[in-house]
Amino acid sequence: SKPLADCLQCNVCQKTGKCVFTDDGVNAFTEKAKHADGFVFATPVYYAHPSGRIFDFLDRAFSSAGDVFKFKPGAAVAVARRGGTTASLDALNKYFGISQMPIAGSTYWNMVHGNVAEDAPCDAEGMQTMRNLASNMIWMMRCFAIGKKSGVPYPDTETGARTNFIRR
């Protein structure tokens, strides 16, 4: 119920590992995320895009603690009355892709439709998609745990090159 501040791109978190805003749960979440095996982020769809709150939350969480998410499976879910779900999923999946997170899919796009929350269970295909998504997430997390326990190393990450579209 507290408002979420948007990321100021102040880059203080790059030095401290924590966001400068401390009273809205983002830092507490990233601490808990260190011990998580995977993530599902869901959003209502407003005007054919994710809610501003989830953007504020994810911008700050991924900027301040991006390595916490690395090599952990992620899934996005969008809920709408009608349109905008695929655009919303695309926007949320960007956080996973840039953070080296495998993206969990399902048997259809990870979306549920309904005008109000009580409508969602009536979306038979949406509910089936959510059940399959849950099964796929569990399977991925189990596979990753077996790999980790067996000593399979994470892939090396090449760094150093950064391109700017402005050349002088």
Predicted region positions:
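N-terminal beta1-alpha1-beta2 submodule of the flavodoxin-like/Rossmannoid cofactor-binding fold
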Residues: S1-S64, A120-R168
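Short connector loops at secondary-structure junctions
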Residues: S1-C7, S106-V116
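Short, glycine-/small-residue-rich phosphate/pyrophosphate-handling segment
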Residues: G52, A65-H113, C122-R131
